[in-house]
Amino acid sequence: MSEQVIIFDTTLRDGEQALQASLSVKEKLQIAFALERMGVDVMEVGFPVSSPGDFESVQTIARNIKNSRVCGLTRCVEKDIDVAAEALRVAEAFRIHTFIATSPMHIATKLRSTLDEVIERAIYMIKRARNYTDDVEFSCEDAGRTPIPDLCRVVEAAINAGARTINIPDTVGYTMPHEFGNIISSLYQHVPNIDKAIISVHTHDDLGLAVGNAMAAVHAGARQVEGTLNGIGERAGNCSLEEVIMAIKTRHNILNVHTNINHQEIYRTSQLVSQICNMPIPANKAVVGANAFAHSSGIHQDGVLKNRENYEIMTPESIGLKEVQLNLTSRSGRAAVKHRMEEMGYQDSDYNLDDLYSAFLKLADKKGQVFDYDLEALAFINRQQEEPEFYHLDYFSVQSGSSVMATASVKLICGEETQSEAATGNGPVDAVYQAINRITGYQVSLVKYQLTAKGQGRDALGQVDIVADYQGRRFHGVGLATDIVESSAQAMVNVLNNIKRAQQVEKEIQRLQQHNNQQQNDSKQQNSQETV
C-alpha cells in the first residue's frame, strides 16, 4: 500500500516574495480558495508578525479555509510565535511553522551564536508554539549546508521538544539530488526518534534542481514536500509543486507514494496564480506551459495521432486541460494538416491535400504558426499571407488620463475606402478597439491580450498578441510598434483581416456547395429525361 506525500503550498508566503507588489487580501483569499479546491494539505499563507497587512491576510484566510490546514511562518522569536497564534486561532485547523539557521556560516555570521545556543533556542520556541497547537513544524534553515552530524543533533532535539514535522530546506538551492537524498537517508539512519515526526523538504531552484532534489528526498523517505505553484519565489524560485505532484502520479510504479491532490484543478489553479501575480508561465514550463502538450514536429504529430502514449507520458485531461494541441508549423506533416481539416469538418473530397500541403508549407515558412482560418483560406480561396490585406491602420489618436474617460479616433483603409470613427472605452486600448468595431460593424470581443517587450531601453518595441472572439470563432492577431496602443491597434487590424479571409472562405464554400447541388440536379433531370 502506498504512503501519502503531504503537499505543503507556500505560494502565498515564499512565492509572494518574488512579486514586485504585495497581493491584496482579496487576491490572496482568491488564491487560497483555489488551493483548497486543488486539495493541498497545508497552505502557508504569510508571516503574521512582518506587517499589519500580513497579519490581516493570514487571519482572513484562516477564518475562511475549511478543508486545508492553514499555516503561519515565524522566526524562533517569542513575539513571532505569539502573533502567529493570534492570527491563526480562528482557523478550523492551523500549524505554526518556526525556523532557525543551522549551518556553520549562518550561525557564525548571521546569528553570531553557537550550535548549542541554536538548539537551546529551538527547543524553547517549539515548546512555546506547542502551547497554542499540537501541530508545530520546525525548519533547519540552510540545512543543505549543515554538516549531517550537526543536523541530526538539531532534528533529534526538535522532535523531543514537540515538533511533529521537521523541514529540511535547501535554502540556497546548493545541493545535488544525490546529496540531498543522502541527507534525508542519514536522518532516518541516525536520529533515534525520527519515527515520531514527518520529514519535510523545501527546495530552491538556484541551480535548476529544486524538483530533482525534492523527488530524491521523497525517494529517500521524505513525506512532505513544500513548494509553490509555477515555482514562483525569490531569486530563481521554489520547487514547482505541480511538477512534483505529476511526477508522483506518473512514476507511482517506482515511488509507491501518492498525494491527495485533485489533479483536475492543477491547470486552472496554475493559470489563476499566474494572472493574479502577473507572472506569465513560460511556454516550455513542464506540466502547465502552453507547449507542455503541444506537438510541432511532423514525426511526433503523426505518432500522437496514432497513439498519444507515443509522445505523451501524461494526458492533458489529467491536469484539467481538454485536449492535446497540435501546432501547425513548417515542421508539421501531411497527417497533421489532414487531421486538422477533419476536425473542422472537411472531407478528403472537399479539397486537394497535395495542393493544400504545398501552400501550407510556404505560408508556415513565412508566418510561423498556421491557424485554422489560414488553412481554410489556402484550401478554398488560395489566399497567401503576402497578398494585400483588406484593412489597414491609417491613423489613430488617443486622449486619456486619470480624470478623463479614454477617447480614441481611428481611421482605417477598408479596401478602396477610408473610414473613421471615434469611441470611448475603459482605457486607451479599449477605446481604440471600440472605434474599430464601429468602423467595421464587427462585434469583436477580446479573449486574450499579451504584451511582450522586444529589445531594451528607449528603442524597445512592444509586441501585442491577442486572441479575439467573433461569432463563436477565435482569431489571432499580432502587432509590433514602439507605442503599445499602436501595436494593440495593429493586432486588432490583423484579426479583422483574418475574419475577412474567413468570410471569403465561407462564401466560396457556399458557392461550391451550390455548384455541386446544381450539378446533381442537372444529372437527375438528364437521367429522368433519358428514362422517359
Swiss-Prot record:
GO terms for molecular function: 2-isopropylmalate synthase activity; acetyl-CoA C-acetyltransferase activity; manganese ion binding. SUPFAM superfamilies: 2-isopropylmalate synthase LeuA, allosteric (dimerisation) domain, Aldolase. Its EC number is 2.3.3.13. GO terms for cellular component: cytosol. It catalyses: 3-methyl-2-oxobutanoate + acetyl-CoA + H2O = (2S)-2-isopropylmalate + CoA + H(+). Its cofactor is Mn(2+). Catalyzes the condensation of the acetyl group of acetyl-CoA with 3-methyl-2-oxobutanoate (2-ketoisovalerate) to form 3-carboxy-3-hydroxy-4-methylpentanoate (2-isopropylmalate). Homodimer. Belongs to the alpha-IPM synthase/homocitrate synthase family. LeuA type 1 subfamily. This is 2-isopropylmalate synthase.
